UniProtKB/Swiss-Prot annotation:
It comes from the Bacteria. This is tRNA-modifying protein YgfZ. It comes from Colwellia psychrerythraea (strain 34H / ATCC BAA-681). Keywords: Cytoplasm, Folate-binding, tRNA processing. GO terms for biological process: iron-sulfur cluster assembly; RNA modification; tRNA processing.
Amino acid sequence: MTITTSKQLPSLAQLPETYLIELSEFGAISLSGEEQSKYLQGQVTCDVNSITESNLLVGAHCDAKGKVFSVFRLINRSSAHLLLQPTASIEGSLKELKKFGVFAKVTIDIAEELGFIALIGKQASSLIQQEFSQVPDSLTPVVQIGSTSLVYLSGEQPRYIIIDDKATITAITEKLALPTYSQSVWNLLEITQGFPILTANTSGHYVPQMLNLQAINGISFTKGCYLGQETVARMQYLGKNKRALFCLNSQLEQPFQSDDVIEKQLGENWRKAGDILAHYQADDGSCVIQAILANDGDLPILRIASQADSVVTNQTLPYTLIAE
């Protein structure tokens, strides 16, 4: 039996009470070996030394200039570190990690054997309890039950990522028998929660603070040296960063195009306002957009360049930006 994934693209308000998301474009880089923690500590923004079997870290992997290859959620599974992230950002990050990994006792690879599904909504915790007898939460966000890893993500709608081999994930999905949506709906939730989504096209362009990593505990300023650390510290303590990640809303008459541009009004003219990282357009035309814009004052009047009559508004994120 195969998983039947709905092709519908509901708005946030139209999602059912409890549902699944097939994370078909989600994956993980695995690091294992005697020096896995020591090596990773020198490569990423979070404090790898603080990871345990039951906690979760957010972090970024940067180049020497502090530009971000990937943003990930770090967990431990079967004595290995897993960097959970969209598959679109894995290749570039993996290449760079392997480049320096040859000098350490560490094995670095894509966790190809794993499958991922997300359980979300009002009854999600009850279903997790029923199926696994233990529920991760804000205090213990990672739980290991046999071969299954359960990861809790807080938010207006708590999310649970279920990780196991692909056959087991399929079996769990069939047993739960809930409405199941595509990865696009996951992107909707990530955008509204202010969690940055990077692809091959946007990897290597932004420092962590432009992606709001400092606001979601994705940067340790006390851990010591890592690749790109000087740039990240300079941005934080010298107030060099003037851009931030925003969640924008619009109601569009036409489909949003991958090459669309956000414009700002300057008098009678319009100019590019910033960069679009990701978007989600529901079947009813409502659209949420993840964009990097100037953060040095009130947002100007915005529009989608290809749809001149569009109105773009700012949606408040569930966190505040730490003062630079």
